[in-house]
């Protein structure tokens, strides 16, 4: 055993140099200082959320997401310099960023549905992508309610009672029976129109028709139909709608869905937009579908992702925005934001500090400019 340890009263130089290592402040000159909200100033939610950017961690990401969405909302073509051959006409004054909104089914099952409905009701977004569950759950809620439950409720007991659990929400199985009673006659009409009128049904056209038929102001897709906002669902059969189509194919066979027309339509929404923005809640097919459409314009200009996914498994859901930059799905000079959070916590805050604050009804000219042509 070594016995060369020397004990002195002087502090070892190595210890001092290691602990009191001098900082180079050059990289800190333009960085904001960490500071949270002072509740001595009273309760002011706008000021509170403004301080999120300097709180740190995911609060800072929320603050950055608020800024990114506000950039989407505020952009106008008329503010850009005229390019050679362009006219400074009325269309430039009403041309805005085209906003793509994507969300997974669990958010429509939750109370986030009402927030999404608000955005669609007031034409605040231009293109929607949802999973099948995000479509059917909206219609089912118009027919019967979803209830609060608990995460720990036992699956076996719930199954015996005919109660389906979505996290800490409960959906009586009777709701899906009511959904079947409502949708089957509509599917019959679709088959008839396909045969007699030559109607080509796409997932977006089906959702549009169902939005019209539900005729309920609580519905996201009622307002999407009314405001002519396209809703794409590339995996429309992956849910209760698919279950209904399965049963319907035995009773009234022949319904055909054309997915090629929809992929052309959503890609062209991106291709022909002057600026595009993506707000994506959750991951999976909805995230990739929107990002991939924006590849066709060499990337979105503005992007906000909200999900709990991590990138270590190589999943698209967990991928950071920088990975999308490498694929050409987000612009090289963009300032995308990912918030690592469950969307039901964050999205109400984002909407409160962006869309709801700047709400102003779009002019007829603005609405006309964003209308789709897929159903023409």
Swiss-Prot record:
One of its GO terms (molecular function) is deoxyhypusine synthase activity. Its cofactor is NAD(+). SUPFAM superfamilies: DHS-like NAD/FAD-binding domain. It catalyses: [eIF5A protein]-L-lysine + spermidine = [eIF5A protein]-deoxyhypusine + propane-1,3-diamine. InterPro entries: Deoxyhypusine_synthase, Deoxyhypusine_synthase_sf, DHS-like_NAD/FAD-binding_dom. One of its GO terms (biological process) is spermidine metabolic process. NAD(+) binds at residues 105-109, 131-133, 137, 238, 283, 308-309, 342-343. It comes from the Eukaryota. Spermidine binds at residues 136-137, 243, 288, 314-316, 323-329. The active site is at 329 (nucleophile). Pathway: Protein modification; eIF5A hypusination. Its EC number is 2.5.1.46. Gene3D superfamilies: Deoxyhypusine synthase (3.40.910.10). One of its GO terms (cellular component) is cytoplasm. Keywords: Hypusine biosynthesis, NAD, Transferase. Belongs to the deoxyhypusine synthase family. PANTHER family: DEOXYHYPUSINE SYNTHASE. Catalyzes the NAD-dependent oxidative cleavage of spermidine and the subsequent transfer of the butylamine moiety of spermidine to the epsilon-amino group of a critical lysine residue of the eIF-5A precursor protein to form the intermediate deoxyhypusine residue. This is the first step of the post-translational modification of that lysine into an unusual amino acid residue named hypusine. Hypusination is unique to mature eIF-5A factor and is essential for its function. This is Probable deoxyhypusine synthase. It comes from Dictyostelium discoideum.
